[in-house]
Amino acid sequence: MLEEENSQMICQIYRIYTKDISFEAPGAPQIFQKEGSPDIKLDLDTSSNLLAENTHEVVLRITLTATIEGQTSFLCEVQQAGIFFIKNIENMQLKHCLGAYCPNILFPYARECISNLVSKGSFPHLHLEPINFDSLFMNYVQQEAEKQNESDPIIIKNSEQD
């Protein structure tokens, strides 16, 4: 019984915090005179690092760039981070936990920060749709596997006999 408890997979949140935040409206106030909906470009990235044994920091970076008629309306960047205690999770499961599970936890906090920044910048309400981090992670794993297969050398043995 005790052995089962010691081998149970654990992923606990120690802390969630905003690591870095930035909002720019380089075209203000002239941009407020333009009509139409802005084109929104979303860049997303995750990273993680080991802080101590079984303790990981995961950072979700979201950068939004809004343009109207080719002019930048606003640029918003949020780095939402969390410290997670992760135990008895190894290899691919650990990569999935750090690359998909933890970012899923962080995303609502980042989305709220972005929404608040955009509205305080006097721009129309912006609601980011949920992101399927599991799917993004699986695509990443597949791309890495394809890169690995492409970089594996092909060895052709020529066994000519005289």
Curated annotation (Swiss-Prot):
Primary subcellular site in the record, as a coarse category: cytoplasm
Family: Belongs to the SecB family.
Gene name for this UniProt entry: secB
Gene3D superfamilies: SecB-like (3.10.420.10)
Record-linked HAMAP family: SecB
Name listed for the protein in its UniProt record: Protein-export protein SecB
Domain of life: Bacteria
GO MF, any single term: unfolded protein binding
General function of this protein: One of the proteins required for the normal export of preproteins out of the cell cytoplasm. It is a molecular chaperone that binds to a subset of precursor proteins, maintaining them in a translocation-competent state. It also specifically binds to its receptor SecA.
Subunit structure, interactors included: Homotetramer, a dimer of dimers. One homotetramer interacts with 1 SecA dimer.
NCBIfam families: PRK05751.1-4, secB
Keyword check for Glycosyltransferase: no
Cell location: Cytoplasm
Record keywords: Chaperone, Cytoplasm, Protein transport, Translocation, Transport
UniProt xrefs under InterPro entries: SecB, SecB-like_sf
Gene Ontology CC terms, in alphabetical order: cytoplasm
Entries under Pfam families matching the protein: SecB
Organism annotation: Hamiltonella defensa subsp. Acyrthosiphon pisum (strain 5AT)
GO BP terms in the entry: protein folding; protein tetramerization; protein transport
